[in-house]
Structures are given as C-alpha cells and as structure tokens.
Regions:
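Polytopic transmembrane helical bundles with strong interfacial aromatic enrichment
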Residues: 1-180
Length: 180
C-alpha cells in the first residue's frame, strides 16, 4: 500500500518506464496477480504432479519475474514485488490447495470411507504446494528485509542478486530439511 500511495517515490523509476502513478499501480497489480494466475495454472496441470519438474519450472518463472520486475519498476520495488509474488503464492497455496485437501481427507475419514483418487490428487497438489511454501520462506524473508540494504538492489544487476540470494536461501532450507 505504501508503494501505491506514493508510487512516484517508491514504485516508479522514470529512467526505466515513464509510468503515471495509475499506470504503475495497474502494471504492478497485473504483474502480481498475473504471476499468481500462472502459478495456479501450472500447479493444477500435469506439470504440478512431478515435484522436480514443477519446482524447476517455478524457479525459471521466478527468474523471469525478477528480471521483468527490474525492467518495469524501481530497483527497490522490484525486490518487494518478488516478495509479494512469493507471499501471494504462499497464501494461495494454503487457502486454495492445502486446506481444501485437508478438508476432503477429514470428510472421508468422518464418513468412514477410504480416500479415493480425487482426494489423492488433491493431497499430491497439497504436498507440492506445501513444499513450495517451505522453500519460499527464506527468500520471502530476504525480500522483506532487503529494503534496509540498498547494496543488494541498487544496481543494474540487482535482479540477478535477487535470484542468487533466492537460490542460496532455498538451498539452505533444503539442507535444513535434509538434516532435520
């Protein structure tokens, strides 16, 4: 909201794209919800059934989103946008994937039925969504605190720094998962 309330100060970099405030806000919302829509299409498709393919594809899309946000918005806003995408996906994963699968499973148990194929598919989607949330946690925290460290975002290759830090933090999370 802060970035939208004063878009000319926070969101817009006129040397990149000479947006009006309304244009920048509309582009930002389209970028955010468009990214979430693409994620949902992938997670619900056959590509979302294989954790490796799914994770690889999401990583590639996040690299593209990182680069794209750096082309459109101020450097600082770019980091915040990637964090907002991660956060939106994480919330969507819980409300539109994990919780419905949990409800379906609990309903089967309450009725004394064995979960069928549909519930199994929901459970697989929920597992992959939960895995994404697990790996997105540290990169999300990094994007949240990044505004306090201009040396991370205040140059033309800041989008690449964002990608590398995302890889490093996700790798750290993977290491932690394997050891605990």
């Amino acid at each position: 909201i802060v970035y939208y309330a004063n878009a000319t100060a926070y969101l817009i970099d006129p040397s990149k794209v000479p947006f009006t405030s309304i244009g920048a806000i509309a582009t930002s919302l389209l970028f955010l919800f468009g990214s979430y829509f693409i994620y949902e299409v992938i997670v619900r498709s056959h590509l979302g059934k294989n954790a490796f393919i799914f994770s690889t594809l999401i990583f590639i899309l996040l690299v593209i989103a990182s680069w794209g946000s750096y082309q459109l918005f101020s450097d600082r806003a770019s980091f915040i946008h990637i964090g907002a995408i991660l956060g939106t996906v994480m919330v969507g994963n819980v409300f539109f994937g994990i919780m419905p699968a949990q409800r379906a499973l609990v309903d089967c148990v309450r009725r004394g039925e064995k979960p069928g194929k549909e519930v199994a598919e929901l459970a697989l989607q929920a597992k992959n969504r939960s895995l994404m949330n697990n790996y997105f946690t540290l990169p999300l925290i990094f994007t949240m605190i990044s505004n306090h460290y201009p040396m991370m975002y205040a140059h033309e290759k800041g989008w690449l720094v964002l990608v590398f830090v995302g890889v490093i933090t996700a790798t750290a999370r993977h290491y932690f998962n394997q050891k605990h």
